[in-house]
């Protein structure tokens, strides 16, 4: 390391090296070192490391491609519905754009999955049963967008012949969240403006992985869109929660500094009953923050007493003035 000029150091997956927090800290203390550290799980920012580097690092969260990035990467802006179909049936991982056939994509996603499950989760967490972990993964993938508790997951899986207790479910889900394979979204009491401790939702980092895991039964347009919108809000650096308004649910409460926005997500609201159901929870919120219904319907933007119905694809592309 030179003393009279900057030295740029890049570490990838350094969490696999013993005593790596001490290595990072010692280098970070040197005034002529600019240090970049990447890691594929939340252990990189565990309390021990955060304490060592307190106030001296900037965290940049990385995600697979957003829909807009995918469209730009595939040069498919002339047909957004087809681009969206490709986005959810192939994958949002950048490398898959270079792959020609669906079988090649499945092979690649299988490799990603095995790396996360076997090398990252099973090895580091020392979980005892890879088959049970895979059962939890498939159950979670099949229930994206559903309100869940670890007890309910344990009860349903046990009833289906895969006996598992609540503590084991908690341990496995925690491991999945730490590797960013799954994201947990907590509930937020809109009226009381506080987080609730129970009954959140889970979303996958990539819908292509869901299709790989579940096959032909993976297609549920509404829940897939909900997962995609959740990831888009993360791309926009929002803190995202599931909203609770009395007995009603708001799909997403997105908070950014002092700004709040509310979202309902549905594949279509052309049926009047569906539209009224999606409007109902938003109409109960008595504040002036923006409220949206995002849908795949290719209809002009509409306004229902301040609640905007917007095409989700145009919203993700940033083409809609909100």
Model-predicted regions and their roles:
Residues 10, 34-40, 61:
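Structural recognition of the conserved hydrophobic beta-strand(s) that form the central parallel beta-sheet
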């Amino acid at each position: 390391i030179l003393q009279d000029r900057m030295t740029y150091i890049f570490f990838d997956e350094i969490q696999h090296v013993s005593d790596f927090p001490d290595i990072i800290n010692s280098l970070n203390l040197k005034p002529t070192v600019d240090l970049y550290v990447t890691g594929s799980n939340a252990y990189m920012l565990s309390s021990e490391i955060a304490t060592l580097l307190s106030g001296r690092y900037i965290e940049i969260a990385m995600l697979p491609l957003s829909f807009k990035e995918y469209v730009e990467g595939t040069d498919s802006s002339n047909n957004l519905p087809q681009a969206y179909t490709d986005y959810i049936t192939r994958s949002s991982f950048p490398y898959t754009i270079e792959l020609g056939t669906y079988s090649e994509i499945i092979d690649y996603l299988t490799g990603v999955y095995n790396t996360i499950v076997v090398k990252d989760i099973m090895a580091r967490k020392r979980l005892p049963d890879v088959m049970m972990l895979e059962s939890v993964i498939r159950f979670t993938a099949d229930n994206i967008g559903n309100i869940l508790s670890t007890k309910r997951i344990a009860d349903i899986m046990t009833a289906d012949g895969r006996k598992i207790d609540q503590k084991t479910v908690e341990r496995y889900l925690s491991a999945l969240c730490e590797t960013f394979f799954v994201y947990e979204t907590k509930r937020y009491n809109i009226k009381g403006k506080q987080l609730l401790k129970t009954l959140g939702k889970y979303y996958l980092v990539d819908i292509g992985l869901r299709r790989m895991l579940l096959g032909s039964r993976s297609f549920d347009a509404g829940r897939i869109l909900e997962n995609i919108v959740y990831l888009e809000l993360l791309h926009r650096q929002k803190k995202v929660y599931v909203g609770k308004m009395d007995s009603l649910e708001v799909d997403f409460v997105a908070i950014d500094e002092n700004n709040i926005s509310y979202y309902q997500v549905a594949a279509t609201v052309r049926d009047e009953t569906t539209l009224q159901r999606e409007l109902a929870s938003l109409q109960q919120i008595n504040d002036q923050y923006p409220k949206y219904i995002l849908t795949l319907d290719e209809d002009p933007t509409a306004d229902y007493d301040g609640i905007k119905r917007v095409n989700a694809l145009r919203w993700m592309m940033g083409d809609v003035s909100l």
